[in-house]
Amino acid sequence: MRLGIDIDNVISNFDSELLKEYIKYDKSLRNTGIVNKQAKYIRNGMFDWTDDEDKLFYKNNIERIAKKLGVIDGAKECIDKLHKAGHFIFIITGRDNGEYTDPYNMTREWLDKNNIYYDKLILTDAYNKKGKVIKCLENNIDIMIDDSVGNCKSCIQNNIKTFLMDTPYNRFADIPRVNSWKEFYEVISNMSKKKVILDTDMYNEVDDQFALTYLMKSLDVFDLEAITIAPFSKSGYAKTMTIEDGTEKSYEVTLNLLDMLNKSEYKDIVYKGAIKYFKDSKDSNEAVEKIIEIANKNDKTTILAIGAITNVALAIEKAPEIIDKIKVVWLGGNTFLTKDNSEFNFRQDILAVQKVFDSKVELVVIPCRNVASNLSTTIYELEHYLSKDIKLNKYLCDIFIKCKKSFMKEPKDEIGSSKTLWDLSAIAYEINADWFKSELISCPIVLDNGLYRQTIDRHSVIFVNDLYRNKIYQDFFIKMKQQ
């Protein structure tokens, strides 16, 4: 998982060092000591200083104090163990608040001096109430630990699992808390895998089969709770008569692929979804019922949607209470630069897209054209990295070649050509969001004609703007070497 960790009073012993400095200075200023031992804050009523005296001392000394802070018991050891267990460590601190000369380098040097491991250091302004939650969303943080009630509430409001590190000043808040690093480590260890649902139009194109394979090769990251079959109409590749026919064929292909993956135990969690699009789907279906059941059971479930988003929209329509319990990563539409959304997953069910976008669900949108379209590969690359000694790899190569050649009108079309495995993007995003460049934006309005109208004051969603193609394929090909 991707863990966001605050520094002061979470990793560092900020308050204990600050208190020592206040007591020391008070001897020369008043020599009255602590006048209110019940005060929650050192700087608010604990000493009988004036506001001006407090502000002057704090301003003149905070940088010196910050540089010599110690580490809370167990913090370094537990962070090391979390890193070793495969978690990504994001240090997210509000020190870019005008109180320090060079806050980034000061913080980096302190972390290095104390041998604190981290994958990424992020600074925000502590006085910006949304500063941390914006960075959490942009970096796909799964869990945040902080001492600030305000920061934790903002994260919770944006469906980010959050824990308070217990301090005297935050005990009034009814927010899940931990009292030590040992306790935090135990909590994380018990919830390490991401609970996911794959919503897929498996028979529509071959990239769905690559995506399911990638997911099943990444079960160290994912706890797959269901595979739900999304509707699709006749495409350029799949030869289907009706949506219902496509659903049946998607179901069969999914079961066959699970056998080939030696994961037949997952065949019992494959569920058929809508056979009509959102507007005409009056009745529920087993996929929608299962999405609702799983969402209500878990604290957070991520739906990896790589087809028309009908099943997700129907689940939200029937059970809006799940909105705060799910995260949707959807491959669909195009970037704003293209000025159109004539893309297969989007155009099939615009009403479903409108429903999901308007619902305020936690949403990550991976556009197809100009983003996922970068995930192109060739016959020669696949044949090089997918050993034909492995039956599954040979099968994937064969269906890729068959699909690619079906779009060729004459032999010369193969020269210098490639094909995109679009659906790998959604799986890769949840494996490592650092392979993507994303932006937190005001949710666009989806017009009836399928276009976006950009906004400035709606709820926030994440749009992916770019991806690191080589990082994703490197991870995929390495995993495909495993039997």
Please annotate each region the language model reported.
Residues 190-483:
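N-terminal acidic, glycine/proline-rich low-complexity segments
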Residues 9, 65-66, 94-100, 233-234, ...:
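Short histidine/acidic/glycine/proline-rich micro-motifs that form metal-
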Residues 97-143, 149-156:
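Substrate-recognition "cap/lid" segment bordering the active-site pocket of phosphatases
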Residues 137, 148-192:
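Asp-based, Mg2+/Mn2+-dependent phosphohydrolase catalytic module
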Residues 28-30, 37-77, 87:
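Metal-dependent phosphoesterase signature
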Residues 1-53:
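Active-site neighborhood of HAD-like aspartate-dependent phosphohydrolases
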Residues 108-124, 173-191, 327, 351, ...:
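Structural recognition of alpha->loop->beta junctions
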Residues 66, 75-107, 122:
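Substrate-recognition element of Asp-dependent hydrolases with the DxDx(T/V) motif
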